[in-house]
Amino acid sequence: MSAFTPASEVILRHSDEFTQRRVLFAGDLQDDLPAQLETALSRVHTQQYHHWQILSRVLGENAHYGLFASAETLADCDTLVYYWPKNKPEAQYQLQNLLALLPVGSDIFVVGENRSGVRSAEQMVADWAKLEKIDSARRCGLYHGRLDSRPTFDADTFWDEYPLGELTVKTLPGVFSRDGLDIGSQLLLSTLKPHMKGKVLDVGCGAGVLSAMLASFSPKVRLTLTDVNAAAIASSKATLAANQLEGDVFASNVYSDISGRFDMIISNPPFHDGVQTSLDAAQTLIRGAVSHLNTGGELRIVANAFLPYPQVLDETFGSHEVLLQNGRFKVYRAVKSRAAKK
């Protein structure tokens, strides 16, 4: 989160525009531009816990993490800089929340990579603000307008659900497995035997699909679910509640907020951060697993077959095995021995 993203570089081309503004930065923010850009006030709202961790070190209480922006978050702000995500429903969800709280007459800047669909911004907010494209660079578009009226934001209308066997999965925009069980998770689940016991950590839990399915055929497991995405945390809590299942669900940047040890760690680890490919989280997941597993405990993950995880698994655990694979995915298993690196 050190180098500026292309979207932030476009904002920097207009840095003089912001020196007297009280700015709220929100959306798919992936760098520390709010801490670097000269403004009268810089405040951040993010749904990504790992981004909040970094920005809060510099911005302190002006960095906010959570599912929704609050009136307090937007208090005294006269400008919104919104980073367009790769997921259109997520953008709609976040923008309606933000514009419902932003004072009428405030300036709105929307920036994002062309391939992420930022062109949709004009039509999406047309009922409340007229956006015009003011710059195009670094394969990004920058749009500007003023808020003419506030939308009504009803968070309940953005919830979705789908059946999975006898389970109900609850989801919000921007959450992995929002539209159904993905092939990778299905492959991982097929390797889990029924009637398992012990403490299980689900890292990058998304909508809680893996944990809910596991608990449905192994009711004695004790579940801990974590994710960086506030929408995923809310979705997982809702999925467990909808199926009368129990588990601890909270935000953690891989192991940042994890204490204790587990008998199994399961994950379908992400390798995209926004629209950029990143293996950092998955490698942190593997390398840190031995510090959070009991001796004899195992890490079981599913990943795209082309990703370079075998070497990291062997360096960390001493060995690994491929439990199952198809043309696209592999399910890896690595067991913590007494000799495993810590």
UniProtKB/Swiss-Prot annotation:
Its EC number is 2.1.1.172. Keywords: Cytoplasm, Methyltransferase, rRNA processing, S-adenosyl-L-methionine, Transferase. This is Ribosomal RNA small subunit methyltransferase C. The gene is rsmC. Pfam families: MTS, MTS_N. Monomer. It is found in: Cytoplasm. GO terms for cellular component: cytoplasm. One of its GO terms (molecular function) is nucleic acid binding. Belongs to the methyltransferase superfamily. RsmC family. It catalyses: guanosine(1207) in 16S rRNA + S-adenosyl-L-methionine = N(2)-methylguanosine(1207) in 16S rRNA + S-adenosyl-L-homocysteine + H(+). NCBIfam families: PRK09489.1. InterPro entries: DNA_methylase_N6_adenine_CS (IPR002052), Mtase_sm_N (IPR013675), rRNA_ssu_MeTfrase_C (IPR023543), RsmC/RlmG (IPR046977), SAM-dependent_MTases_sf (IPR029063), Small_mtfrase_dom (IPR007848). The lineage of its organism: Bacteria, Pseudomonadati, Pseudomonadota, Gammaproteobacteria, Enterobacterales. Specifically methylates the guanine in position 1207 of 16S rRNA in the 30S particle.
